[in-house]
Amino acid sequence: MSFIDSMKLDLVGHLFGIRNRGLAAACCALAVASTIAFPYIRRDYQTFLSGGPSYAPQNIRGYFIVCVLALFRQEQKGLAIYDRLPEKRRWLPDLPPRNGPRPITTSHIIQRQRNQAPDPKFALEELKATVIPRVQARHTDLTHLSLSKFEFHAEAIFLLPSVPIDDPKNVPSHDTVRRTKREIAHMHDYHDFTLHLALAAQDGKEVVSKGWGQRHPLAGPGVPGPPTEWTFIYAPRNEEELAVVEMIIEASIGYMTNDPAGVVIA
């Protein structure tokens, strides 16, 4: 073997050693990072499962889906966004401020309330079995009840299929109706008794500013999710809060059905 050939072998061996050491260091760093991250991921996965049934399967695949969608997460309580929307009508009266701080909500895009829970018997008997059917019954000529297209496990109020949504007179609400697939509102009766519903911009502003709810984390312009008008309503804890939530559901139907009772806000 010549001196040059020997040098070549030494160089190759040196480079191979460097590469092996680099690979070993990378594997070591990955192992350390995984050890540190695993407890957080495990807790986060358990939080995801605790949110109950939704559009994402209750397994690792569903968790991966919500983690990817979380990259598009939007701010949920700002008010300026409402004044940029074209709808200037309002169906809600002035609301009283909700008592106390806002409830803690999940960090996932599957939106749930984590504290300030109402009594389940009260929520099921008064909100699910009484208020929601009562509000929908006032609008049977325009709405019907069916399984939610967002949650898959909840009953929802829908605009009837026979109601046209391409009528120029319905602008700008018809775009919201299209994006929600005619769904107006649903309640998470199998979990925390919160609701999701569509509100006209000025009604959404009133609800958020008075502490009764917040936007969906994927709601906003340019986001692959529900429209900006899609709003999360905190669970009512007593009769007074239930009365406010009933007004909010009524306003949601008014907006989505283009009820002439809407008043333009200057």
From Swiss-Prot:
Its main location: membrane. It catalyses: 3-hydroxyhispidin + O2 = (E)-caffeoylpyruvate + hnu + CO2; 3-hydroxyhispidin + O2 = 4-[(E)-2-(3,4-dihydroxyphenyl)ethenyl]-1,7-dihydroxy-2,3,5-trioxabicyclo[2.2.2]oct-7-en-6-one. Keywords: Membrane, Oxidoreductase, Transmembrane, Transmembrane helix. The availability of a complete eukaryotic luciferin biosynthesis pathway provides several applications in biomedicine and bioengineering. One of its GO terms (cellular component) is membrane. One of its GO terms (molecular function) is oxidoreductase activity. The keyword Oxidoreductase applies. It is a single-pass membrane protein. Pfam families: Luciferase. Coiled coil: none annotated. It comes from the Eukaryota. It is an enzyme of class 1 (oxidoreductase). InterPro entries: Luciferase, Luciferase_dom. Belongs to the fungal luciferase family. Luciferase; part of the gene cluster that mediates the fungal bioluminescence cycle. Uses the fungal luciferin 3-hydroxyhispidin as a substrate to produce an endoperoxide as a high-energy intermediate with decomposition that yields oxyluciferin (also known as caffeoylpyruvate) and light emission. The fungal bioluminescence cycle begins with the hispidin synthetase that catalyzes the formation of hispidin which is further hydroxylated by the hispidin-3-hydroxylase, yielding the fungal luciferin 3-hydroxyhispidin. This is Luciferase. It comes from Armillaria gallica. The lineage of its organism: Eukaryota, Fungi, Dikarya, Basidiomycota, Agaricomycotina.
